[in-house]
């Protein structure tokens, strides 16, 4: 899947440091507002213990995890919607992503200059929200002027539906609400909404960057963010960038786990963030398991068996006959594919089967 999460935020809040932790890439991380001008793209392995447990049973020649793309986008400043700073570049880059990781500075550090002079993550959030909403409002007003007359005077049903969608978005945006807060019931409305490619329709997660000693429970700044986003149904993730940088330096899994235990964490913030980003993109995983490889495959939640087969190869979808499905828990409990067959735990599914997260699949096809 070529879906991407974009890391966004004001300059100097910790975006590039976070990106480096995620990908071990060397995006320039400097105390300078526009050190990330061209977006850095990292293909990040999604941690999944299920893959490792399957491999322990199957003993394949290789193990192939699934991945998600993370894009580090240049810092936005006030006036971006009008092209200020790197505004036009920022808006173009964010439009190409599928979900937003909104990074908020929740730490004090006199050595790292804040563009507005003081630390206030809620103000920072509102600056980004305002710029994105303003750009969306421009898009809506441009479109609405073109269809308004047709919708109000003619018999063009499509124009009327389009006008209704645009009007509802316009009302929400003028109230300072994101487009994602507006929902539509009919498929026609949903298609029109999707085709508008609005910036604030993208799902968002807030990543609060904190000091090392606040990595477990957060701080007063994180509490401010929680209060500000309580009605958004958005996830908040606390992450200490310096701690994560230290974790990334350890060579082995055992060393990392020992360090995490010492600082009171069960797993790294990076691992939690990657999984959360995967979920934010509405992605799930199915597995294939054989002596050559045990592999995780990414698919959009709600996909049916033929579409999931096509992720492996287009011929699998074109010539789809059936899917042989074993539930992950059954495979782990019984220990092998043959044992699952003998226990009646392999299910034969057809074209309408909606693949479930964790399914172990074998596709039959004929081209």
List the predicted regions and their residue ranges:
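Flexible beta-alpha connector loops of hexameric P-loop NTPases
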Residues: 76-82, 117-132, 151-158, 264
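C-terminal-of-GTPase-core extension/linker across diverse P-loop GTPases
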Residues: 2-8, 13, 19, 146-354, ...
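Amphipathic, soluble alpha-helical interaction motifs
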Residues: 57, 100-103, 131, 143, ...
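Switch/coupling subdomain of P-loop NTPase systems
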Residues: 89, 95, 99-102, 107-135, ...
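Conserved nucleotide-binding/hydrolysis micro-motifs of P-loop NTPases
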Residues: 24-25, 50-51, 75-77, 105-111, ...
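Alpha-helical initiation/capping and key positions within long helical/coiled-coil segments
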Residues: 36, 85, 89, 132, ...
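Short amphipathic alpha-helical segments
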Residues: 30-31, 112-116, 218-220, 250
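Conserved G1/Walker A P-loop phosphate-binding module
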Residues: 1-113, 122, 141, 147
């Amino acid at each position: 899947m070529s879906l991407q999460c974009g890391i966004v935020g004001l300059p100097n809040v910790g975006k590039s440091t976070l990106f480096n932790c995620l990908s071990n890439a060397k995006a320039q991380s400097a105390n300078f507002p526009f050190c990330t001008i061209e977006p850095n793209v990292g293909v990040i392995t999604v941690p999944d213990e299920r893959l490792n447990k399957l491999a322990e049973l199957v003993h394949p020649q290789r193990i192939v995890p699934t991945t998600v793309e993370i894009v580090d986008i240049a810092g936005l400043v006030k006036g971006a919607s009008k092209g200020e700073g790197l505004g036009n570049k920022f808006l173009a880059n964010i439009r190409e992503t599928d979900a937003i990781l909104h990074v908020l500075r929740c730490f004090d550090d006199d050595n790292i200059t804040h563009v507005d002079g003081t630390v206030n993550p809620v103000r920072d959030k509102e600056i980004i929200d305002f710029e994105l909403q303003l750009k969306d409002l421009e898009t809506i007003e441009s479109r609405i002027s073109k269809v308004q007359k047709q919708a109000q005077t003619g018999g063009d049903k499509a124009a009327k539906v389009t006008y209704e969608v645009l009007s509802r978005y316009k009302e929400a945006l003028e109230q300072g609400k994101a487009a994602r807060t507006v929902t539509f019931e009919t498929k026609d409305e949903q298609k029109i909404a999707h085709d508008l490619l609005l910036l604030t329709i993208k799902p968002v997660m807030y990543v609060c960057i904190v000091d090392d000693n606040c990595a477990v429970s957060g701080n007063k700044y994180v509490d401010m963010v929680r209060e500000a986003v309580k009605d958004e149904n958005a996830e908040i993730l606390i992450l200490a960038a310096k701690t994560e940088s230290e974790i990334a330096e350890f060579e082995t899994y055992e060393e990392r786990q020992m360090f995490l235990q010492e600082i009171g964490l069960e797993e790294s913030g990076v691992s939690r963030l990657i999984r959360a980003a995967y979920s934010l993109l509405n992605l799930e995983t199915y597995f294939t398991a054989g002596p050559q490889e045990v592999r995780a495959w990414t698919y959009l939640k709600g996909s049916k068996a033929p579409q999931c087969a096509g992720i492996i190869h287009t011929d699998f979808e074109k010539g789809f006959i059936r899917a042989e499905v074993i539930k992950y828990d059954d495979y782990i409990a019984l220990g092998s594919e043959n044992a699952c067959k003998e226990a009646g735990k392999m299910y034969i599914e057809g074209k309408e089967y909606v693949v479930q997260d964790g399914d172990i699949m074998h596709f039959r096809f004929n081209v």
